[in-house]
């Protein structure tokens, strides 16, 4: 998925205001930079006042450059959504370490050092002055929490989202409880909507330090309301009550940082940093970037990467463009598509036939004929620098003698075995006049299905059991002795037929007689319109098929007569995509008039494959052979749909009709109209709620629920 000039790799996190993605920015000559993209959620992007405030704060935060602050590189808009491009930190946030602390106590010196580094970054922001006027800006973070402090695997501590929380905390934009746990880090003056200063961030850092030491929050409260009551009117639980081994000096730092009266609190983050650094020095333990990195590697050994994004998933988990291209390349090598309406690369001057075989990755440019159930098919090559050379020579394909019993065995063989046998390709010969025209194949055994697909839908199944015989000729003259044309049509699914080799030296055309096994005996059916618009008769008496060929050099004619005692039904010939496209530079196959004989056009004209319809033999007894027609495709009426958006407070994993959609927030989804069952799960709150929602076609429905009130 692309956002502006950035390619999304995978989703990292989501919150009440935005969702965060790992992204890449590409440049010339292979330049590439990994960064993080934070995209504002659509419902906030629709508020012009919010966007204006957010843009102003983004400009301000972009000026902050400090080792302990995540740097902002870019701000932009794409597809109606605003985003920030910022520095990528390879490592966890402190929330993961808090969870670790609930299981195993973290060293006090380590906790103090990490919080001191965050305090240094915040102190820099608090003291930042306007570049033009030199006046202090009085910038306050207002949203310090373990989620917004990151620790890289190199031991660097970084404060993120500086300035964005200030926008969210303005007046009517205080989204209490939307981002989980934020209320727990607010001092009393912030909850009372009093004037705030940098001591707001001091209090929040004190709560973060308390959690790192104990794995718990300072108050035993579970809801936002009870937490607010505790912050305003209750004393926090002493850290010594939960962890007696915490040194007294560090307990005193916590008492001062968490004072309800801000006048008794540290005046700024710089003062808090100083006391924490003194404590670290007093322990006598070296705690620097190297020691922090070692601890992170020990406690958080790996960060599981989400699956790369795919184009169809959009903003959900999943892929970069290079991965999508690689998947596309792999798919094209496994099963090249067959499109009969829009040709792409012209076929080389070898064989033209319907294609539905995997490409050989070892030889991607040479057309490789493959025998599938007795039908020889050639693989269309991909374009390559060697293609012109390959197209300059005819490719002669030699097939073994066709026998009814051999063809039946080939049809009953597994597809993988059939593909690997029956065809040999020899190197180009010196004679340019040699051209191979393949116009026949054996039928499947009784009751079997023919394996010769003609459209992508028919690639893995075949239901036709028709048979007929054709002969085709090819113009063989061309200035310079080169081949003027090649065979443009190969009839698919033929019971009887011949392999005719036509030469440009006036040699006769000699079809080879094949005696196929009888067709499948099916019950009597009424006449069914065929693909060509003709009616398929119920009875199919024996037919005589006459095919003619004319040499384009001197007008000499050769009219071999081929007849079988097998009942046949006329059928429109199946030809490859490029054989029917004039601009592909290849011969075109057309229906011939019903009279006997046929002629090939002169040099440069199209090849005409002629056939005659079946003629009744006068036998009163109907032939039991039947034509098995594909049932007409029924178009399914489109289901009316509407859009459903989920606004859950604080968040939840949403399932719709038993299918998991993901964790909120996420974009609105398109669902069929009607009543649906919604399940919301929030493990942190211990909530599992099921509701129903009615969706109307063509309308947007918003599902709102506050899980904390449930």
From Swiss-Prot:
Residues 6-280 form the Protein kinase domain. Its EC number is 2.7.11.1. It is a single-pass membrane protein. Pkn5 and pkn6 may have reciprocal roles in growth and development. Pkn6 may be a transmembrane sensor of external signals for development. GO terms for molecular function: ATP binding; protein serine kinase activity; protein serine/threonine kinase activity. It comes from the Bacteria. ATP binds at residues 12-20, 38. Residues 1-482 are cytoplasmic. Residues 504-710 are periplasmic. The chain crosses the membrane at residues 483-503. Belongs to the protein kinase superfamily. Ser/Thr protein kinase family. GO terms for cellular component: plasma membrane. Its main location: membrane. Pfam families: PEGA, Pkinase. It catalyses: L-seryl-[protein] + ATP = O-phospho-L-seryl-[protein] + ADP + H(+); L-threonyl-[protein] + ATP = O-phospho-L-threonyl-[protein] + ADP + H(+). Keywords: ATP-binding, Cell membrane, Kinase, Membrane, Nucleotide-binding, Phosphoprotein, Repeat, Serine/threonine-protein kinase, Transferase, Transmembrane, Transmembrane helix. Autophosphorylated on serine and threonine residues. Sequence repeats lie at residues 337-348, 358-369. It is found in: Cell membrane. It comes from Myxococcus xanthus. This is Serine/threonine-protein kinase pkn6.
